[in-house]
Amino acid sequence: MKFELAKEKIRLITDDLDYIREYFSVKDETARFRMRGRARFYSNSRVYCITPTGLFEPGLFFDILSYIKLEYPNTDYQIDLDILPIVKPVYKEERAYDNLKFPLRDYQLDSVREALKFGRGIIKLGTGGGKTLTIASLLMSLYSNNPKIKILIIVPDLGLVNQTYNDFLEYNVLFKFTRWTGKIKPDLTANCIIANRGILQSQFDNNDWIKYIDVLVVDECHTIKKSNKVSKMVNKIHTFNKFGLTGTLPDDKPEQWNVIGKLGKVIYDKDSYQLRLESYLTNVDIKVINIGYKDKPLVVSGSNNFKAELDFIYTNNFRNNVIKNICSKFNNNSLILVNHLAHGDALFDDLSQIDNKKVYFVKGEVEVDKREKIKKIMETNNDVICIAMSSIFSTGVNIKNIHMIMFASGGKSFIRTIQSIGRGLRLHESKNKLIIIDLADKLKYGTRHSEKRKEIYKSEKINFTLTDIVEK
C-alpha cells in the first residue's frame, strides 16, 4: 500500500482500493432526480471522495490513513516524503499567544496549540465558544515569529467583516489588519486582510497576490460548498497553512469531505454541549409547539404542495396570532427567524401593534450599518423584538442579550438549526437560560421537518418539551 503525491492531490495505490473507496462513499440521493427523463432504468450511484484511480484531496489524508490502520493493521504502507509537509505543515517553534485584552479560555488555548502543531486543519467550537478570539490568538502566535507574514481571512458576509475587524481592535492585536469589501479597498501593506466571500468571488482573478499569501483562515468554513466559487478559490491558494473554524460541519457527508479535503482534518473539537456543561454557554430549553389547523391546504397530485403549504402557514391568521401572543407576553429580547421576505413583512406589521415593544425586521435591503445599530439596541435594551431572515442571522452574529429565539418558518437544515440556536447561547448577566420556541405545523411537510429538528435536538443533547395548540 502506497501514498504518493500527484500534483495537487494524493494518490492511494493498493489492491484494496475498491473496498476503501466504498467506505468513503455515500448513496447519491440526487441521482434519481438527475436521471429523470433521461432513461427509464438507472442504477443508484454513489458519491465518492476517492477517485477510481485513487486520487483524493490532501486534507483527507489523516482520515483515510486512520481507517487503513484500523482495518488493515498488518499491512505495510509507504508514504512519499513530499506528502507530510503538505498534510502537516507544522510550525516548530511558535508558542500559543495569550496576551490579548481578554485571556484565552483553556479550550481556546488548547485549540491554538493544536493548530500550531498541525499547521492546518479545522477547529470546531460550538457557536458562542469564541472563535474570533481564537483566530486572533493563532494569528498573533504566527506574527510574533514572522512580522512580515501575510494572512487572508475569509468570512461569509459584510457584517462579519466589520464584526471581525472591530473585535480585533478590541482585542489589541499587534499585527496590522485591514478590511476588503465592495466599498473598502484593502491596505496591501497590512499583515492581515479580512474579506467577505462576495468581493473575493468578483476580484480573485484580478488579484494574483491572493494565491501567494502565507496563511489562509476560513471563518464559518462549513459554508464552503462543492459547487461554490470559494471552494475553487481555496484550492488555487498555494499555501499549505489553511485553517477553518466553525461551530459544526455539514451533515451531508460529501460536503463534509469537501471542507476537510480543502482545509485539513478536524484538529480540535469542543461542541456546544460540552461548553454548556462547563458553563461557558448558557443553558437552553426548547419548547416545541405543535399547531393544529381547522382547515388545511389541499394536497393536489402533481402540483407544488410544499409551496402551497408555506403560503398557507405564512398567511394564516391563527398561526400569526400565536406568534404575537407569545411575543407580547415575553419580557425580554426576542429573535424571530424567518425564511421568506413576505412572511417577515407580515409578522412585522402584526408585531408592531404590540405596546411597549421595539420591533425591527433585518432583511437583505437593510444596510450593514443599520444592522449594527439594531444589534447595539438589543444589547442595551430588554424590550426588543427582532425579526430576521435566517440567511442573515443564523451565522456569525454576536448578540449576548437574546433571551428567546423563535423558529417561525420550520425547515430541517442541520447547520442552520444549530447555528441559529447558537445566536442566543452566549452568556449575559441578565440571562440564566435561553428559550427556543419551535413552531411545528401539523401538516404534511411541517410534520416531517419537525421530526428532523427533534432528531437534531437529541443529537445536540438539548431537552425539549411538546405542547399542542389547536385551532377551533
Region locations from a protein language model:
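Post-DEXD/H (motif II) to motif III coupling segment of the RecA-like Helicase ATP-binding lobe
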Residues: 222-286, 457
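Conserved pre-motif I regulatory segment
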Residues: 80-124
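Conserved SF2 helicase motif VI
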Residues: 412-432, 436
